[in-house]
Amino acid sequence: MAGGALPGFRDFYPDEFAQRAHIFRAWREVARRYAFVEYDGPPLEPLDLYTRKSGDEIAGQLYNFTDKGGREVALRPEMTPTFARMVAERANALRKPVRWFSIPQLFRYERAQRGRLREHFQLNVDIVGEVSELADAELLSVAISIMQELGLDASDVRARVSDRRLLNALLSEIGVREESPQAAVYAVLDKISRQPRDVSVAKLAEAGLTPVMIEAVLELPAVKDLGGFRPELANAAAVKPHLERVATYLSHLQSLGVRDWVDIDLSIVRGLAYYTGIVFELFDAKGELRAICGGGRYDDLLNDLGGADLPALGFGMGDVVLGELLKARHLMPETAGTGADLFFVGGNGALEHPIGDALRLLHLLRDAGFSVDYGLSAERYQTQPTRNQVDSARKSGARATICFDSGTEVLVQGLVGKLKEAPSRKFASRPLLAADATAIAALKDWFTETISTRHND
């Protein structure tokens, strides 16, 4: 028999699936509050969709092959190119600004390690058709609101923000004006916290920067507020408009109530080649994990992919690192949850009400909206001691048991946490079996008030 899942891939047993669902619920709930609508696209796309603009790093990590029709295809390693293609195809018909989100499964062939697998699920949130800094602020506010929804605060997570246009202007003033050395600077800044200073110096020198330029470049990541730049840089005519734009952006974040989560960090450049403006990443404040989330403005990508000249911005937030952070902060559910609302057991009335009556009643209860479990054995229902069936119900995680307590009554008894202290309740069995709407509503109301409201006590 084959072993477990492939390296870097995951099986989702019920407990793990519940944890994934916990994250997905937060993603969808916050997206709903911000008026984003959900979409999806194919997991398999033409290879050149990813090799065109994503850069060499992703191109080398693709799961790609030639299909039976001779087409070069790849499993999606990211969602933004698919999103851009879809929007470009209907650019004239879509109401602007577009506010879409998706939760695709993505695939990259890379070394599996902590926080990075060969597959993961990722929330993608994108806005198309708006150039204002308010759209950039709205986007980051979505990401931070998700952190809050999951129980995290600004002491747990920091948002590090930069602007590629500002950085390009600063580099030009420093003297780094050509595309090739600028790309080398981006690569150094992206890794500056993870490599020794002398390595950064050597790489910048190799790119043709002078010692004076190198020193000026290496000062940039130390700037933590907009007043921290050298005066000759901050006052340069080419730089000032970009500083003003970032200041406006930060002001919007203040108004949205999330400014205290945000740090200026010019080492945040994002690895993908298509970002053009404000970019950001979210990290755990202790610095123990990889980036939780990253994104920014990519105003040229839609035009490059489909000829739709529309400004756009977005972010991706994966489930792997976020899940690790929630576990580290004890904010992740440990089990698959509460099980069924009700577990049907044989009681004192099992002889008067054989399994057929039990099946009719549980069917009616399911139609009324309850989740109902039972032992799937007529023999156990009739003959197994009630205490053994109740023990099975408790192990299943059911909130309460339900049984025929006599020939004329149904008994509901809570099982979970303080529900064990809640009073049991008896209902007349005949109206329930007759599908009497009033009787079923009475049971449902009692359950909602007595069981559901106490479940999380």
How should these model regions be labeled?
Residues G60-G69, G175-L204, D284:
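Acidic, His- and aromatic-enriched active-site or binding-groove loops in soluble protein domains
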Residues I144-Q148, R165-E173:
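Hydrophobic mid-domain F-helix/FG-region of cytochrome P450s
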Residues G55, P196, A234-A237:
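Glycine-centered helix-coil hinge/cap
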Residues A154-R165, D263-S267:
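Short, surface-exposed recognition loops or helix-turn segments adjacent to catalytic cores
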Residues M1-P81, E89, A137, S141, ...:
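TRNA-binding/sensing appendages of the translation machinery
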Residues S172-A183, A187, I192-Q195, E352-F370:
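Acidic, Ser/Thr-rich low-complexity intrinsically disordered segments
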Residues Q19-A35, E45-P46, G69, T80-N92, ...:
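Positively charged, Gly/Ser-enriched RNA/tRNA-binding surfaces
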Residues L75, R95, Q113, L117-E119, ...:
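Short, well-structured alpha-helical patches and their helix-loop capping segments
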